[in-house]
Amino acid sequence: MIRLSLPRWLRRLAWLLLALVVVALGILLGRAFEARGKPELMPWHRLVLAAEVHADSLPAQARWADYLAREQRLFDELRSALAAAPVSGRLRYEVDSHIGPAAAARDWNRSFESTPPAPRGGVLLLHGLTDAPYSVRGLATLYEQAGFAVIAPRLPGHGTIPSGLLDVRWQDWRAVVALAMRELRARVGPDRPLHILGYSNGGALALDYTLDALDADGDALPRPQQLVLVSPMIGLRPYAGLSRWLPLFGGIEYFEKSRWLDILPEFNPFKYNSFPVNGAVQSYLLTTRLQARLLALASSGRNQRLPPILGFQSVLDGTVSSHAVVHSLFEMLPANGSALVLFDINRASLLADMFKVDAANALDVLHDDRPQTYRVDVLGNADPATLALVERRYDAGARDAVVRPLQLAFPPEVYSLSHVALPFACDDPLYGMEPRMDEDFGIRLGTLRLRGERGALVVAADQFSRLGCNPFHAYLRERIAQTLPPPPASGAGAAPSP
């Protein structure tokens, strides 16, 4: 018998790799046991809705009407499934719940659309991860008033139950984006502008689609002429990539909770609180692909074909990487009229001296005095002694700022904006600090003022204290309006708003 003698270094390497695998499996198994201590899974964490759309079940010649018909079947199935597994209680999905739209009201968990008689353009609005089309409905009115056709699709896995994100893939979202853009082009005609507005994960999808459209032949994928990105998900925290391994043992019923990062009560009518690992994994796969494509585009010089991008980003963002928005997106852009609005922290807040060093220096990390190919607008305190707001504008190629006072101010209790705050006005009936009363969804998250002993709730206190609306929403709308074509001259027959 011939015996193979491996070099000593190779044997040591093999043993080291084996040891690392054993340690990794031990850590994942320990995490699976730890996950068993999470709250109990409910029907909305386990149900599988067969009518949900996936890319491989969407025919190549599918139309927008087909998607809406499939969505109707999905919500019919959802109602039947929840009725067959009733759970007593007052929260969302529970039998005594009043959380959600009234029976006769529009369900903002579903896709919505509007088309005026003579559209001046079209806009696709893409919501974020765990969200629903509700998160872009406020900004949709801006485009409707400008005579634009509007389509806001419900992306697969969203708007129904949290388990919808257990098996969704980012390719499913991409397929629906392409379908909706083709419908939008058909509605507005070949010579009208198309815009895409993406919030959070929707921002990543907007960019990914745009890159696909640049590479597509002919009119297979209509190209947008303008992108608006609100808190765009360009990059995630480094540990997000490791999360794909967390549910390794999740296929075993005993460890099924390891498929979830959060298992929480559902009290938001238009957003999931519970969050499966797969949702984070799909966003990570999408954003890593996107960053690589943007870098390759800039390196080849083909970034000149990109449309102008208007971005809005809080310097403090607990969901996405603000650093990636600047360095992986905007620094990859040509001089094409793009602009980035940064919302600074409130340096006149009573809490200003309590900021962590990283938070206090967040703006300096994102913006310095180097000339850029894009315009930068920093919204912040006029000085550290006042709540009054100014815009510091750095034009493309400029080192010095042009300062413009604004008729805006930080609310005294707000020390910063947040990832989730930007698209919502402060009179939003769900998230607003001063909500309109013309709509009632059974809860007003923006006005909750909870007090009690710490550690008593299964929901972390910061979920209620996180700012959910934008005190500077009027500025955001004004800047978006500047990307729209000017209204027709008097007497030219402007298209009426739907």
Q: Which role fits each region the language model picked out?
A:
Residues 197-206:
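Gly/Ala-rich beta-loop-alpha elbow adjacent to hydrolase catalytic centers
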Residues 227-239, 345:
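Active-site nucleophile loop of the alpha/beta-hydrolase fold
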Residues 138, 208-212:
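Active-site signature of alpha/beta-hydrolase-fold catalytic machinery across serine-
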Residues 2-122, 222, 406-415, 424, ...:
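Flexible, membrane-associating and regulatory peripheral segments of lipid-active enzymes
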Residues 102-158:
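Short, surface-exposed "cap/lid" segments of acyl-processing enzymes
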